[in-house]
Amino acid sequence: MCKVIAICNQKGGVSKTTTTVNLGVGLVREGKKVLVIDADPQGNLSQSLGIENPDELEIALPSIMEQIIMDKDVDVTKGIIHHEEGLDLMPCNIDLSGVDVSLVNAMSREFVLKTYVESMRDFYDYILIDCMPSLGMITVNSLTASDRVFVPVQAAYLPVKGLEQLITTIYRVKKHLNPQIQFEGILISMLNARTNYAKDIMELIKKYYGESIPIFESKIPFSVKAAETSAAGDRKSTRQNSSHNTTSRMP
């Protein structure tokens, strides 16, 4: 049975895309069929997987969602890009910002992405959705389409403070739109474990959320080298410097 996981945080720069890529590659290496969906108009996931100019793509997530909004038949085989590491990618580009506006007046507006995801379940073991850094309609669509939500959070005060709003939104989606959604867990990223500040942040997360939400023991350390290689486009090096143990908790 396919499992759909949203990688979500309204704060940017907390390793959502890095987590999505690493999780996807890890699952592929365990023999799973994986589709990753870029649901961010910035197209960071698409670029991380080698799409240099996602804005030039004729078919991407925005065009698929527009077809669904207009109640047109969608060929689910179109637009999927197969990556050399075994992942399939549904890319995204800046046009998703326009879709976000279109959704305001759309019928069943929270379920547009779910319509696409449901059509893909039979082909994959896992579908991972890299959410945009906001709590707008596209993110609500991503949560409505998912079975689980995975929350990377930077080991710093402001990102942790923003968790409350994110978790409230997820519970509202669960109550009104998607009763099946569950927390996969919180993954602490960009951690400098040598500082007392980072340790205090970790304890704060455990204190407020540890009883209700799983917190992964694996953590992504802060790495200057990883940040530099990511900025330079060295995707392989970035993956090698990131946590690779998270998939051990995936069923």
Language model features: what each stretch is:
Residues M1-R239, T246-R249:
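P-loop NTP-binding core
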